Protein backbone atom coordinates (compact mmCIF):
# COMPACT_ATOMS: atom_id res chain seq x y z
CA UNK A 1 0.00 0.00 0.00
CA UNK A 2 1.38 3.42 -0.93
CA UNK A 3 1.56 6.17 1.67
CA UNK A 4 -1.17 8.10 -0.17
CA UNK A 5 -3.48 5.08 -0.08
CA UNK A 6 -2.71 4.47 3.57
CA UNK A 7 -3.59 8.06 4.45
CA UNK A 8 -6.81 7.85 2.46
CA UNK A 9 -7.76 4.58 4.16
CA UNK A 10 -7.01 6.05 7.60
CA UNK A 11 -9.16 9.10 6.86
CA UNK A 12 -12.14 6.99 5.78
CA UNK A 13 -11.74 4.71 8.80
CA UNK A 14 -11.78 7.73 11.13
CA UNK A 15 -14.97 8.97 9.49
CA UNK A 16 -16.62 5.57 9.86
CA UNK A 17 -15.51 5.16 13.47
CA UNK A 18 -16.95 8.55 14.47
CA UNK A 19 -20.05 8.41 12.30
CA UNK A 20 -18.89 11.44 10.30
CA UNK A 21 -20.48 12.01 6.92
CA UNK A 22 -18.15 11.69 3.96
CA UNK A 23 -18.28 11.46 0.20
CA UNK A 24 -16.05 9.09 -1.75
CA UNK A 25 -16.30 11.44 -4.73
CA UNK A 26 -15.20 14.41 -2.63
CA UNK A 27 -12.32 12.44 -1.12
CA UNK A 28 -11.25 11.33 -4.60
CA UNK A 29 -11.20 14.94 -5.80
CA UNK A 30 -9.22 16.10 -2.75
CA UNK A 31 -6.63 13.34 -3.08
CA UNK A 32 -6.29 13.75 -6.84
CA UNK A 33 -5.29 17.36 -6.31
CA UNK A 34 -3.48 17.22 -2.99
CA UNK A 35 -2.70 13.58 -2.17
CA UNK A 36 1.06 13.91 -2.68
CA UNK A 37 1.12 17.03 -0.49
CA UNK A 38 -0.28 14.97 2.38
CA UNK A 39 2.68 12.58 2.30
CA UNK A 40 5.58 14.91 3.10
CA UNK A 41 4.24 18.02 4.82
CA UNK A 42 2.66 18.83 8.16
CA UNK A 43 -0.50 16.74 7.73
CA UNK A 44 -3.30 16.22 10.25
CA UNK A 45 -6.65 14.48 10.52
CA UNK A 46 -9.26 16.35 12.56
CA UNK A 47 -12.58 15.50 14.16
CA UNK A 48 -14.89 18.12 15.64
CA UNK A 49 -18.29 18.00 17.28
CA UNK A 50 -19.69 21.30 16.02
CA UNK A 51 -23.10 20.25 14.69
CA UNK A 52 -25.24 19.42 17.72
CA UNK A 53 -22.59 16.96 18.89
CA UNK A 54 -22.48 15.31 15.46
CA UNK A 55 -18.85 14.73 14.53
CA UNK A 56 -17.32 16.08 11.32
CA UNK A 57 -13.99 14.99 9.85
CA UNK A 58 -11.46 17.28 8.19
CA UNK A 59 -7.95 16.88 6.82
CA UNK A 60 -5.35 19.61 6.50
CA UNK A 61 -1.75 20.26 5.59
CA UNK A 62 0.80 23.05 5.75
CA UNK A 63 3.92 23.64 3.67
CA UNK A 64 6.85 26.05 4.00
CA UNK A 65 6.47 27.95 0.74
CA UNK A 66 6.31 31.70 0.13
CA UNK A 67 3.65 31.29 -2.55
CA UNK A 68 0.19 29.88 -2.00
CA UNK A 69 0.24 26.69 -4.04
CA UNK A 70 -3.05 25.51 -2.53
CA UNK A 71 -5.04 28.20 -4.34
CA UNK A 72 -3.63 27.20 -7.72
CA UNK A 73 -4.11 23.48 -7.12
CA UNK A 74 -7.65 23.96 -5.83
CA UNK A 75 -8.62 26.04 -8.87
CA UNK A 76 -7.09 23.57 -11.31
CA UNK A 77 -8.73 20.57 -9.63
CA UNK A 78 -12.19 22.13 -9.45
CA UNK A 79 -12.24 22.40 -5.67
CA UNK A 80 -12.42 26.20 -5.76
CA UNK A 81 -14.30 28.57 -8.04
CA UNK A 82 -15.43 32.19 -7.86
CA UNK A 83 -18.43 32.93 -5.65
CA UNK A 84 -18.92 36.61 -6.44
CA UNK A 85 -17.76 37.43 -2.92
CA UNK A 86 -14.70 39.11 -1.32
CA UNK A 87 -13.34 35.65 -0.44
CA UNK A 88 -12.54 35.22 -4.14
CA UNK A 89 -9.55 37.58 -3.98
CA UNK A 90 -8.74 37.67 -0.27
CA UNK A 91 -5.99 35.05 -0.11
CA UNK A 92 -4.07 36.74 -2.93
CA UNK A 93 -4.41 40.08 -1.15
CA UNK A 94 -3.06 38.53 2.05
CA UNK A 95 0.04 37.22 0.30
CA UNK A 96 0.59 40.57 -1.41
CA UNK A 97 0.19 42.61 1.78
CA UNK A 98 2.23 40.44 4.17
CA UNK A 99 5.18 38.22 3.14
CA UNK A 100 4.50 34.57 3.91
CA UNK A 101 6.78 31.80 5.11
CA UNK A 102 4.17 29.05 4.68
CA UNK A 103 0.63 28.30 3.59
CA UNK A 104 -1.90 25.60 4.33
CA UNK A 105 -5.27 24.19 3.34
CA UNK A 106 -8.16 22.54 5.14
CA UNK A 107 -10.72 20.13 3.65
CA UNK A 108 -14.03 18.72 4.86
CA UNK A 109 -14.28 15.18 3.47
CA UNK A 110 -18.00 15.61 2.81
CA UNK A 111 -17.66 19.04 1.18
CA UNK A 112 -14.21 19.79 -0.25
CA UNK A 113 -11.90 22.76 0.28
CA UNK A 114 -12.92 24.82 3.30
CA UNK A 115 -9.98 27.11 4.14
CA UNK A 116 -6.65 28.33 2.88
CA UNK A 117 -4.13 29.69 5.40
CA UNK A 118 -1.59 32.46 5.04
CA UNK A 119 1.29 32.03 7.49
CA UNK A 120 3.71 34.94 7.91
CA UNK A 121 6.34 35.43 10.51
CA UNK A 122 4.69 37.00 13.57
CA UNK A 123 3.82 40.60 12.63
CA UNK A 124 1.86 43.47 14.26
CA UNK A 125 -1.88 43.10 13.74
CA UNK A 126 -1.88 46.51 12.05
CA UNK A 127 -0.31 44.81 9.02
CA UNK A 128 -3.65 43.10 8.38
CA UNK A 129 -5.43 46.43 8.05
CA UNK A 130 -3.67 46.90 4.69
CA UNK A 131 -5.61 44.00 3.16
CA UNK A 132 -8.36 45.64 1.05
CA UNK A 133 -11.09 42.99 1.16
CA UNK A 134 -10.99 42.14 4.87
CA UNK A 135 -14.37 42.61 6.56
CA UNK A 136 -14.82 46.13 7.92
CA UNK A 137 -15.50 44.56 11.31
CA UNK A 138 -11.79 43.67 11.62
CA UNK A 139 -10.69 47.31 11.61
CA UNK A 140 -13.61 48.18 13.88
CA UNK A 141 -12.14 45.94 16.59
CA UNK A 142 -8.84 47.79 17.04
CA UNK A 143 -9.71 48.63 20.64
CA UNK A 144 -10.68 45.01 21.31
CA UNK A 145 -7.32 43.81 20.01
CA UNK A 146 -5.49 46.30 22.22
CA UNK A 147 -7.53 45.51 25.32
CA UNK A 148 -6.90 41.77 25.07
CA UNK A 149 -3.28 41.99 23.85
CA UNK A 150 -4.12 40.51 20.44
CA UNK A 151 -1.34 42.40 18.72
CA UNK A 152 1.01 39.66 17.44
CA UNK A 153 -0.52 38.24 14.27
CA UNK A 154 0.76 34.78 13.31
CA UNK A 155 -1.69 33.57 10.64
CA UNK A 156 -4.76 34.44 8.61
CA UNK A 157 -7.26 32.24 6.82
CA UNK A 158 -9.97 32.52 4.22
CA UNK A 159 -12.98 30.28 4.87
CA UNK A 160 -14.64 29.70 1.49
CA UNK A 161 -17.55 27.65 2.80
CA UNK A 162 -18.63 29.95 5.62
CA UNK A 163 -17.51 33.17 3.86
CA UNK A 164 -15.47 34.34 6.81
CA UNK A 165 -11.89 35.03 7.78
CA UNK A 166 -9.82 34.13 10.83
CA UNK A 167 -7.01 36.08 12.44
CA UNK A 168 -4.64 34.04 14.63
CA UNK A 169 -2.61 35.64 17.40
CA UNK A 170 0.42 34.60 19.40
CA UNK A 171 -0.69 34.53 23.05
CA UNK A 172 2.42 36.15 24.51
CA UNK A 173 1.12 38.47 27.24
CA UNK A 174 1.22 37.53 30.97
CA UNK A 175 -2.50 38.28 31.34
CA UNK A 176 -3.16 35.52 28.80
CA UNK A 177 -1.74 33.06 31.31
CA UNK A 178 -4.67 33.64 33.70
CA UNK A 179 -8.14 32.10 33.81
CA UNK A 180 -9.64 35.56 34.33
CA UNK A 181 -8.40 36.63 30.90
CA UNK A 182 -10.41 33.88 29.20
CA UNK A 183 -13.49 34.60 31.29
CA UNK A 184 -13.28 38.27 30.39
CA UNK A 185 -12.68 37.87 26.67
CA UNK A 186 -15.53 35.35 26.29
CA UNK A 187 -17.93 37.39 28.40
CA UNK A 188 -17.10 40.47 26.34
CA UNK A 189 -18.83 38.74 23.39
CA UNK A 190 -21.51 37.03 25.49
CA UNK A 191 -20.02 33.65 24.63
CA UNK A 192 -20.33 30.69 26.98
CA UNK A 193 -17.62 30.47 29.65
CA UNK A 194 -16.36 26.88 30.09
CA UNK A 195 -15.74 24.99 33.30
CA UNK A 196 -12.93 25.95 35.66
CA UNK A 197 -11.08 22.83 34.52
CA UNK A 198 -11.12 23.91 30.88
CA UNK A 199 -10.13 27.45 31.87
CA UNK A 200 -7.06 26.01 33.58
CA UNK A 201 -6.16 24.27 30.32
CA UNK A 202 -6.60 27.49 28.36
CA UNK A 203 -3.97 29.35 30.39
CA UNK A 204 -1.42 27.25 28.48
CA UNK A 205 -2.86 28.31 25.12
CA UNK A 206 -0.17 29.68 22.75
CA UNK A 207 -2.62 30.74 20.03
CA UNK A 208 -5.92 32.62 19.88
CA UNK A 209 -8.11 32.80 16.77
CA UNK A 210 -10.85 35.35 16.11
CA UNK A 211 -13.40 34.92 13.30
CA UNK A 212 -15.02 37.75 11.35
CA UNK A 213 -17.40 37.83 8.39
CA UNK A 214 -18.84 40.38 5.98
CA UNK A 215 -22.45 40.15 7.15
CA UNK A 216 -22.01 41.03 10.83
CA UNK A 217 -20.26 43.88 12.66
CA UNK A 218 -19.28 41.63 15.55
CA UNK A 219 -16.97 38.72 16.25
CA UNK A 220 -18.41 35.45 14.96
CA UNK A 221 -16.27 33.03 16.98
CA UNK A 222 -13.13 32.68 19.07
CA UNK A 223 -10.93 29.61 19.40
CA UNK A 224 -8.04 28.82 21.73
CA UNK A 225 -5.47 26.24 20.65
CA UNK A 226 -3.46 23.94 22.89
CA UNK A 227 -0.93 21.25 21.98
CA UNK A 228 -0.27 17.86 23.54
CA UNK A 229 2.83 15.83 22.78
CA UNK A 230 1.30 12.35 22.97
CA UNK A 231 -1.93 10.43 23.55
CA UNK A 232 -1.53 10.34 27.32
CA UNK A 233 -1.28 14.11 27.76
CA UNK A 234 -4.60 14.87 26.01
CA UNK A 235 -7.26 15.69 28.67
CA UNK A 236 -9.39 12.74 27.60
CA UNK A 237 -11.83 12.98 30.50
CA UNK A 238 -13.12 16.38 29.33
CA UNK A 239 -15.11 15.06 26.39
CA UNK A 240 -15.86 11.63 24.84
CA UNK A 241 -14.61 12.84 21.45
CA UNK A 242 -11.24 13.75 22.95
CA UNK A 243 -10.98 10.37 24.65
CA UNK A 244 -11.93 8.28 21.63
CA UNK A 245 -9.76 10.21 19.18
CA UNK A 246 -6.73 10.40 21.46
CA UNK A 247 -6.88 6.63 21.92
CA UNK A 248 -7.75 5.60 18.35
CA UNK A 249 -6.45 8.24 15.93
CA UNK A 250 -4.19 6.74 13.25
CA UNK A 251 -0.71 8.13 12.55
CA UNK A 252 2.67 7.06 11.23
CA UNK A 253 3.99 7.48 14.78
CA UNK A 254 3.13 5.02 17.52
CA UNK A 255 2.33 7.83 19.94
CA UNK A 256 1.59 11.04 18.03
CA UNK A 257 0.94 14.53 19.30
CA UNK A 258 -2.35 16.41 19.08
CA UNK A 259 -3.68 19.95 18.71
CA UNK A 260 -6.97 20.77 20.45
CA UNK A 261 -9.07 23.80 19.57
CA UNK A 262 -11.56 25.05 22.16
CA UNK A 263 -14.08 26.98 20.06
CA UNK A 264 -16.69 29.41 21.39
CA UNK A 265 -19.53 31.35 19.83
CA UNK A 266 -23.17 32.32 20.35
CA UNK A 267 -25.73 29.53 20.26
CA UNK A 268 -26.98 30.75 16.88
CA UNK A 269 -23.48 30.09 15.49
CA UNK A 270 -23.07 26.50 16.70
CA UNK A 271 -22.20 27.46 20.29
CA UNK A 272 -19.25 25.78 21.96
CA UNK A 273 -17.40 22.80 20.53
CA UNK A 274 -14.07 20.98 20.49
CA UNK A 275 -11.83 20.10 17.56
CA UNK A 276 -8.83 17.80 17.81
CA UNK A 277 -6.10 17.11 15.23
CA UNK A 278 -3.72 14.16 15.20
CA UNK A 279 -0.17 14.98 14.08
CA UNK A 280 0.05 12.27 11.43
CA UNK A 281 3.74 12.57 10.49
CA UNK A 282 5.06 14.07 13.72
CA UNK A 283 5.63 17.54 12.23
CA UNK A 284 2.59 19.56 13.30
CA UNK A 285 3.07 19.78 17.07
CA UNK A 286 6.80 20.61 16.90
CA UNK A 287 6.00 23.26 14.28
CA UNK A 288 3.31 24.70 16.53
CA UNK A 289 5.74 25.10 19.43
CA UNK A 290 8.46 26.39 17.11
CA UNK A 291 6.13 28.98 15.61
CA UNK A 292 5.30 30.35 19.04
CA UNK A 293 8.92 30.28 20.22
CA UNK A 294 8.18 27.66 22.85
CA UNK A 295 10.25 24.61 23.81
CA UNK A 296 8.71 21.24 23.02
CA UNK A 297 7.92 19.70 26.44
CA UNK A 298 9.17 16.23 25.47
CA UNK A 299 11.51 16.48 22.44
CA UNK A 300 11.88 12.74 22.08
CA UNK A 301 8.12 12.35 21.67
CA UNK A 302 8.26 13.30 17.99
CA UNK A 303 10.45 11.89 15.27
CA UNK A 304 11.20 15.29 13.75
CA UNK A 305 13.92 15.76 16.35
CA UNK A 306 15.72 12.66 15.13
CA UNK A 307 16.27 14.24 11.71
CA UNK A 308 19.66 15.71 10.77
CA UNK A 309 19.89 19.30 12.00
CA UNK A 310 19.83 20.76 8.48
CA UNK A 311 16.50 19.07 7.85
CA UNK A 312 14.95 19.90 11.20
CA UNK A 313 14.53 23.62 10.53
CA UNK A 314 12.91 22.93 7.16
CA UNK A 315 10.56 20.39 8.67
CA UNK A 316 9.65 22.67 11.57
CA UNK A 317 8.71 25.35 9.07
CA UNK A 318 6.11 23.03 7.53
CA UNK A 319 3.60 24.64 9.83
CA UNK A 320 0.02 23.46 10.12
CA UNK A 321 -2.51 25.96 11.61
CA UNK A 322 -6.30 25.73 12.74
Swiss-Prot record:
Activity regulation: Activity is slightly increased in the presence of Mg(2+).
Described function: Prenyltransferase involved in the biosynthesis of ambiguines, a family of hapalindole-type alkaloids. Catalyzes the reverse prenylation of hapalindole G or U at the C2 position with dimethylallyl diphosphate (DMAPP) to generate ambiguine A or H, respectively. In addition, accepts hapalindole A, an epimer of hapalindole G, and catalyzes normal prenylation at its C2 position.
Family statement drawn from the similarity comment of this UniProt entry: Belongs to the aromatic prenyltransferase family.
Pfam families in alphabetical order: PTase_Orf2
Result after altering residue 117 to A/F: Loss of activity
Alphabetical UniProt keywords: Prenyltransferase, Transferase
Catalyzed reactions per annotation: hapalindole G + dimethylallyl diphosphate = ambiguine A + diphosphate; hapalindole U + dimethylallyl diphosphate + H(+) = ambiguine H + diphosphate
Residues reported in the UniProt entry to bind dimethylallyl diphosphate: 46, 60, 115, 166, 168, 221, 225, 275
Organism per entry: Fischerella ambigua (strain UTEX 1903)
EC class of the enzyme, as a word: transferase
Assigned EC number: 2.5.1.159
A molecular function GO annotation: prenyltransferase activity
Highest taxon, organism lineage: Bacteria
Protein name per Swiss-Prot or TrEMBL: Hapalindole dimethylallyltransferase
InterPro entries: Aro_prenylTrfase (IPR033964), Prenyltransferase_CloQ (IPR020965), PrenylTrfase-like_sf (IPR036239)
Comment field on protein domains: Hapalindole A and hapalindole U are fixed in the same hydrophobic binding pocket, but they adopt completely different orientations, which define reverse or normal prenylation.
Amino acid sequence: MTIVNRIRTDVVNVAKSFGAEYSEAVIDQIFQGFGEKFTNTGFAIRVQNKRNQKVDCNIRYGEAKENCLAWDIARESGLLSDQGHPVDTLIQEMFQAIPAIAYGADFDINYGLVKIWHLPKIVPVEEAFKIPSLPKSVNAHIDFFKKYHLDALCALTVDYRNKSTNLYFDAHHPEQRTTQFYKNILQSQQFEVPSDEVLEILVNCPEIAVTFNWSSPGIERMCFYTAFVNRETVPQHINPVLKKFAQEAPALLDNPGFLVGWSFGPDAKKGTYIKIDVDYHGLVVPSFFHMHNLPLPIPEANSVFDLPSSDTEDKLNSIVMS
